């Protein structure tokens, strides 16, 4: 790992054993994009990668250089209005009404390690030897605006972390109207755009399409990262698959409004950008103030989509997630929501807990309805005190009874919201985001608290800290069940209302930081009506997230498959739920529900007391199996093998760190008759090691399993006979492969 500056060509080269990032100071003083990809040997002379040509019908920076138009030059920080007519990465409104900037290279420095980003989540290092950071300073002399571009390269992995700081060293007020965390110009357009898209209950489905001239973009203006579009995109070569081919991806470590775009120009250049959504954003930067953008993490891979994912998984699991629970296997939990909804008593909860404890469950989670006047979703949010009619012995009393049964205790909260029917709203109606004289839109009968205000965040912190102070609560599910509308703060002047969306997220991060610091033993799981704020920013505070409100096994296979493009299995909340499923009314086998949920944190969301004796025995076996192998599921190396978006059969697998144990999940959506012979090519095994299949006892070498494949042929091949074992729709199997010593 090194960062080298070549003075002759004014070229910076960041590189490690696997990746290089090269940029240069351009003749006009800005920064140019030269290369990002496989590691190149360092040398003088990379400036030949800077290409320019005269283009007709354009404007040029220098009067005597007809071939120097910014519209035809690859740049790192394009700005508005000076011969580049593509999308800018920085747009600053000045007091005279101009948005023109001429950012000139001023200086540079290299720091060992990686600096923290003030008030924002970001990847980190535990030792300065793990990374180096290049900080380049640019200055616009007329305004006094100083911009610092931060580039971090890690000792291991194919990732580059980027962000930007804007400092007003001038005498006039500036308005930041667009501040991208990342902008890079790529020298060709032979890419397909891969995004994770969807909606509530079908989050992060994989969609892929060719780039074309013009702009391809995703984003969110909902006040949260959203289930419609995840803050992640990958540019993949057309021939790229899960196992081979080139990928260039970007993931934004942010939980609020964002935009990502690829602009393909008319001369074969692709501009890739990611950052805070510029619509509804206007940040006043007074003299002496600094604005820090969120971090964007670039990843390059020549080992297909799985190679890209492995880089994100390792980085986000080890150097984005933090705290006590980062490296711990997660407790097997039961959540009462789909078992009771709001209709519960302490007696009913303890009855569920009794059966759960007998099955080996480790954590009992009490969901919505335990606080304030909360007997439905019409009241109570904002009043974080126990409802004595529901829990006559309080949270601590119930927790002690749960602990006496051998389990830990957790609760559900929704700290960012308030019902109008609540003591908090009646006392502070100005604490909600709303515009005076206009209607307040409601979602799930609730309003959004103004987390851009410190007094609001302080109040919620004090309420929550009082609940957690006894130490009886060991897990918190932090929900958020509506998007932001009427985004107007009663505490800010008119000129600063464009800051509210971002200040809200900063307030959210502040509350998370204070609670996780004060109560480090608590496992926080983020949630937003399922996976509608499943993003890297949340993983910095909560090492796992509820992946989707849709707990149907078949739907979850697509959701978890897509989520794994960027996020590790240890971050995915995954539960076995009741059938018929409450979201899609589908009936799936119990073993398929478990086989799907294993590839995540694992838990149950149903009343175990309503299961048959045979089903209870199966649940006990499932829990025992997960306890034996959860280290591999949650912290092993994950591979996607067959896509549910392309095939009737899906497969994925986890491999232990020493590569001596592998667990393959195989799932068929619809049953077939007289089907073909079937096999699945595996990955990540030791080629010369003999593995034994725990299902059949068959033994195969790793190279055979990876190149020929694991044979999955069953009774659907040929005419079905009962003696061959009848199969059904929504069937699944697990194959545990152990190295033969």
Regions found by a protein language model. Name each.
Residues 98-105, 283-302, 730-737:
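Short Pro-Gly-centered flexible turn/kink motifs
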Residues 72-74, 79-117, 242-261, 299-324, ...:
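Glycine-rich, aromatic-flanked loop segments that form ligand/cofactor-binding clefts
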Residues 325-462, 475:
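Aromatic-lined carbohydrate-binding/catalytic grooves of carbohydrate-active enzymes
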Residues 3-5, 9-13, 17, 31-263, ...:
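Polysaccharide-binding surfaces and accessory modules of carbohydrate-active proteins
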Residues 392-394, 426-428, 432-589, 601, ...:
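Active-site neighborhood of glycoside hydrolase catalytic domains
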Residues 18, 164, 288, 334, ...:
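Conserved, mostly hydrophobic/aromatic
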Residues 242, 644-687:
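Carbohydrate-binding surface patches
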Residues 703-741:
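C-terminal beta-strand-rich structural cap/linker in extracellular carbohydrate-active enzymes
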């Amino acid at each position: 790992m090194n960062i080298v500056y070549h003075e002759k060509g004014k070229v910076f080269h960041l590189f490690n054993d696997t990746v290089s990032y090269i940029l240069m100071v351009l003749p006009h003083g800005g920064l140019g994009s030269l290369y990002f990809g496989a590691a190149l040997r360092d040398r003088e002379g990379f400036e030949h990668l800077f290409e320019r040509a005269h283009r007709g019908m354009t404007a040029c920076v220098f009067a005597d250089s007809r071939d120097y138009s910014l519209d035809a030059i690859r740049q790192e920080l394009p700005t508005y209005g000076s011969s580049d007519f593509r999308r800018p990465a920085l747009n600053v409104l000045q007091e005279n009404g101009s948005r023109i900037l001429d950012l000139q290279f001023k200086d540079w420095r290299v720091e060992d390690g990686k600096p923290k980003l003030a008030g924002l989540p970001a990847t980190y290092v535990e030792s300065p030897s793990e990374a180096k950071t290049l900080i380049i300073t640019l200055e616009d002399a007329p305004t006094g605006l100083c911009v610092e571009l931060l580039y971090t390269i890690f000792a291991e992995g194919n990732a580059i972390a980027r962000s930007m700081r804007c400092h007003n060293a001038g005498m006039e007020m500036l308005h930041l109207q667009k501040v991208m965390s990342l902008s890079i110009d790529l020298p060709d357009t032979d890419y397909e755009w891969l995004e994770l898209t969807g909606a509530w209950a079908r989050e992060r489905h994989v969609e892929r399409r060719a780039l074309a001239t013009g702009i391809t973009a995703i984003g969110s203006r909902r006040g949260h990262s959203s289930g419609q579009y995840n803050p992640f995109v990958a540019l993949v070569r057309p021939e790229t698959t899960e196992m081979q081919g080139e990928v260039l991806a970007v993931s934004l470590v942010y939980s609020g409004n964002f935009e990502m775009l690829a602009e393909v120009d008319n001369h074969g250049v692709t501009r890739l950008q990611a950052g805070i959504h510029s619509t509804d954003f206007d940040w006043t930067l007074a003299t002496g103030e600094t604005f820090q953008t969120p971090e964007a993490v670039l990843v390059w891979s020549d080992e297909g989509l799985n190679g890209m994912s492995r880089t994100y998984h390792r980085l986000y699991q080890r150097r984005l997630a933090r705290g006590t629970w980062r490296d711990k296997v997660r407790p097997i939990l039961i959540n009462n929501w789909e078992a009771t909804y709001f209709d519960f008593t302490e007696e009913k909860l303890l009855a569920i807990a009794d059966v759960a404890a007998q099955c080996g469950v480790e954590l009992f989670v009490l969901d919505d309805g335990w606080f304030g006047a909360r007997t439905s979703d019409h009241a109570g949010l904002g009043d974080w005190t126990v409802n004595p009619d529901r829990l006559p012995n309080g949270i601590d009393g119930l927790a002690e009874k749960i602990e006496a049964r051998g389990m830990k205790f957790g609760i559900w909260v929704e700290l960012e919201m308030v019902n109008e029917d609540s003591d908090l709203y009646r006392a502070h109606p100005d604490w909600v985001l709303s515009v005076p004289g206009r209607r307040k839109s409601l979602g799930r009968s609730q309003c959004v608290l103004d987390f851009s205000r410190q007094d609001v965040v302080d109040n919620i912190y004090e309420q929550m800290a009082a609940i957690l102070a006894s130490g009886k609560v060991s897990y918190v599910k932090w929900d958020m069940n509506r998007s932001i509308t009427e985004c107007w703060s009663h505490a800010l002047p008119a000129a600063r209302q464009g800051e509210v969306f971002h200040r809200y997220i900063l307030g959210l991060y502040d509350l998370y930081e204070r609670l996780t610091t004060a109560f480090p033993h608590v496992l926080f799981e983020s949630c937003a009506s399922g996976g509608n704020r499943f993003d890297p920013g949340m993983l910095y505070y909560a090492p796992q997230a509820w992946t989707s409100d849709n707990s149907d096994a078949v739907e979850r296979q697509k959701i978890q498959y897509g989520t794994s493009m960027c996020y590790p299995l240890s971050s995915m909340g995954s539960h076995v739920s009741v059938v018929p499923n409450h979201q899609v009314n589908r009936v799936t086998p119990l073993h398929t529900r478990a086989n799907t949920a294993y590839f995540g944190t694992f838990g149950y969301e149903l009343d175990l007391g309503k299961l048959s004796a045979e089903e209870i025995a199966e649940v006990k076996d499932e829990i025992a199996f997960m306890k034996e192998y959860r280290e591999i599921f949650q912290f092993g190396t994950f591979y996607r093998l067959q896509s549910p978006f392309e095939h009737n059969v899906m497969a994925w697998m986890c491999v232990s760190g020493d590569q001596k144990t592998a667990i393959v999940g195989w799932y068929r959506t619809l049953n077939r008759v007289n089907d073909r012979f079937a096999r699945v090519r595996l990955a990540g095994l030791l080629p010369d090691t003999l593995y034994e299949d725990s299902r059949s006892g068959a033994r195969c070498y790793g190279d055979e399993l990876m190149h020929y494949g694991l044979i999955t042929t069953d009774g659907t091949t040929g005419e079905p006979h009962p003696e061959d074992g009848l199969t059904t729709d929504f069937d699944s199997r697990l194959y545990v492969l152990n190295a033969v010593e």
